[in-house]
């Protein structure tokens, strides 16, 4: 928006927005929104996910006023469009006119429209639905538990078998491309390791869409099988049928981390199965196929951005879609094993694994052969781009990664050192010269730091919008409707801490990795995901239901306490301390309590959540968190 008579911006009266800024579905129903405005823009935030592949309309009327009482006016181009003779309009303008007319028709009782538009949401399900169908027909185990796949015994409460899973692979970065097409040159990574930034396509190289959703399998000969760990009760005879748990690890984790929560399951006669996500554990890539050079390691452990790839949002979307497809393949392949109780399979995901598990659960719906008895999400969230940028721990890493990227540093070198960083100069020449210039004086270092701050300020708004738009079709915010409608038995654990409005030293902080909410977006974090899944608060020591669909809010520890007792109360740094002594004992008890909650949910098929120590649980629910 701009003023009609000057460059000055006139702040809008927020009280005039309601009833005059309308988001309407194709049936004429108003969509609940949160409205805000400045003198330059009106911001419409949806309070819940819009339906996929659905048409919506926006109408703004002259009832919107500035703080001085002046009514909003239409831009002249809008007025010309709606007053023109349709026969005199170009085909593009005719289509635009029809969209505007349909939008205005949806708001017959609104005031005089000064803006109207129509849009259709992505068909966010199409590609993953296609992947599910491929998994159902292709996924199978290439080996099974036996003498040759049994690993040495680590503990006395489980046996471990390591087998191979044949699962469709869609990412362009296959193992064959490591040697010839990837060299981790930090000065020019996008050009020296192009496969890392590529994305899933169709067979003909196009973007998968609802019109052509089937992705290309990039390893059609299944040269690379997924190493699958199967933990079973000690002394299992390989015949007795076992209920089974699928575990999904977090970012920088790997399938072996499941060992910290096994005992509650293997002691009770369960098998626990785990695989690695792309760029994790056994699925690491290496530049030049050089596995002996740590500088050539392409893994989330070495650099989170290799998986959370905001430099290539389509690659990030593909990484998430591949992860969902892999676990759907695992679930499908379990049906071929005689010892698996096919109707007694459960899902547990932690952190990124919790985020991914929301989508795994969603795409298991309406397929009896993919059913999960319970779905358990530990510290997940939604709105992934804004989630990262509101995370205590991920935001600083992300900002520094962007500021220190070769793109930003090359641009600064071209500005500050034009005689050195010419068009012909390589990235390495430019960036090395910039670093030398920076080291010459504190004044130079301060100037570069200030310019990097300015660059980030310009990049962040585009990052929020552009990256999130791209990854919407691999974000749990888009995938809650099927499991909610079907009443999927669900337990979600949220780390809320025990602070008041602000945290003091000695108090347990809310989740410092996946924020529970974000001030700048009502759809970011764990709380909006809880709302989207329609989960009820669980505050009592034992909750019975048939089935349970609930959330336990945790006051002790933090993001990773379900697996490890490493997050103590906040210290002087403003982050969780490393607990010792009695505090360690208390946090360790919180870990035990959380693991028992999930184990009881699984063991009772979603009928009970046992809370053995209420000291670790929020027993009073804030009004905004009530169902």
Predicted regions and their residues:
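Acidic, low-complexity Ser/Thr/Gly/Pro-rich repeat segments typical of extracellular/periplasmic
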Residues: 1-177, 186
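Short, solvent-exposed loop/turn and secondary-structure capping segments
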Residues: 34, 55-57, 67-78, 130-133, ...
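Domain-level recognition of soluble alpha/beta enzyme cores
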Residues: 128-129, 140-244
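Cap/lid segment of the alpha/beta-hydrolase catalytic domain
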Residues: 182-183, 192-225, 237-328
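Glycine-rich His-Gly loop
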Residues: 247-251, 350-354, 495-497
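Primarily recognizes the serine-hydrolase "nucleophile elbow" in alpha/beta-hydrolase
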Residues: 333-389
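Serine-hydrolase catalytic core
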Residues: 385-386, 398-556
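C-terminal catalytic histidine-bearing segment of alpha/beta-hydrolase fold enzymes
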Residues: 490-493, 497, 517, 529-627
């Amino acid at each position: 928006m701009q003023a009609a008579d000057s460059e000055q911006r006139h702040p809008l009266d927020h009280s005039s927005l309601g009833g005059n800024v309308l988001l309407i579905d194709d049936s004429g129903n108003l969509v609940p929104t949160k409205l805000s405005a400045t003198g330059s823009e009106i911001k419409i935030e949806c309070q819940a996910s819009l339906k996929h592949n659905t048409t919506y309309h926006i109408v703004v009327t002259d009832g919107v006023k500035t703080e001085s009482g002046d009514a909003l006016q239409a831009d002249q181009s809008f007025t010309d469009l709606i007053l023109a003779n349709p026969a005199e309009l170009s085909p593009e303008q005719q289509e635009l006119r029809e969209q505007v007319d349909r939008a205005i028709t949806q708001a017959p009782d609104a005031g005089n429209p000064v803006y109207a538009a129509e849009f259709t949401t992505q068909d966010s399900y199409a590609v993953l639905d296609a992947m599910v169908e491929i998994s159902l027909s292709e996924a199978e185990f290439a080996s099974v538990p036996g003498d040759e796949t049994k690993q040495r015994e680590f503990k006395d409460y489980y046996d471990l078998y390591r087998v191979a899973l044949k699962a469709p692979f869609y990412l362009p970065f296959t193992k064959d491309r490591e040697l010839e097409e990837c060299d981790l040159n930090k000065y020019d990574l996008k050009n020296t390791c192009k496969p890392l930034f590529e994305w899933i396509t169709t067979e003909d190289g196009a973007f998968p869409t609802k019109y052509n959703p089937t992705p290309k399998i990039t390893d059609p000969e299944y040269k690379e099988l997924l190493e699958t760990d199967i933990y079973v009760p000690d002394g299992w005879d390989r015949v007795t049928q076992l209920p089974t748990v699928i575990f999904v690890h977090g970012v920088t984790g790997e399938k072996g981390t499941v060992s910290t929560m096994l005992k509650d399951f293997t002691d009770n006669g369960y098998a626990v199965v785990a695989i690695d996500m792309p760029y994790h554990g056994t699925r690491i890539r290496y530049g030049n196929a050089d596995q002996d050079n740590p500088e050539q390691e392409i893994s989330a452990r070495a650099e989170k951005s290799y998986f959370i790839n905001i430099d290539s949002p389509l690659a990030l979307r593909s990484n998430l879609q591949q992860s969902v497809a892999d676990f759907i393949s695992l679930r499908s392949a379990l049906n071929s094993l005689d010892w698996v109780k096919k109707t007694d399979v459960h899902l547990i995901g932690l952190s990124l694994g919790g985020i991914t598990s929301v989508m795994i659960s969603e795409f298991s719906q309406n397929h009896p052969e993919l059913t999960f008895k319970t779905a358990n999400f530990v510290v997940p969230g939604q709105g992934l781009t804004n989630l990262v940028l509101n995370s205590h721990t991920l935001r600083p890493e992300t900002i520094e990664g962007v500021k220190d990227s070769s793109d930003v540093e090359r641009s600064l070198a071209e500005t500050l050192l034009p005689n050195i960083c010419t068009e012909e100069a390589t990235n390495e020449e430019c960036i090395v010269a910039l670093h030398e210039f920076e080291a010459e004086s504190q004044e130079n270092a301060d100037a570069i730091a200030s310019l990097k701050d300015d660059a980030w300020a310009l990049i962040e708004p585009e990052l929020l919008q552009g990256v999130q738009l791209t990854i919407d079709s691999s974000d749990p915010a888009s995938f809650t409707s099927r499991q909610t409608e079907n009443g999927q038995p669900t337990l979600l654990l949220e780390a809320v801490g025990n602070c008041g409005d602000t945290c003091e030293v000695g108090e347990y902080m809310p989740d410092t990795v996946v924020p529970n909410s974000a001030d700048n977006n009502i759809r970011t974090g764990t709380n909006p995901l809880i709302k989207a899944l329609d989960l009820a608060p669980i505050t009592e020591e034992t909750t019975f239901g048939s089935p349970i669909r609930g959330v336990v809010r945790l006051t002790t520890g933090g993001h990773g306490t379900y697996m490890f007792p490493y997050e103590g109360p906040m210290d002087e740094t403003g982050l969780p301390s490393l607990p010792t002594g009695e505090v360690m004992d208390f946090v360790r008890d919180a870990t035990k309590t959380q693991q028992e909650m999930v184990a009881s949910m699984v063991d009772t098929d979603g009928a009970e959540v046992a809370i053995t120590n209420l000291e670790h649980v929020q027993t009073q629910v804030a009004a905004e968190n009530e169902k």
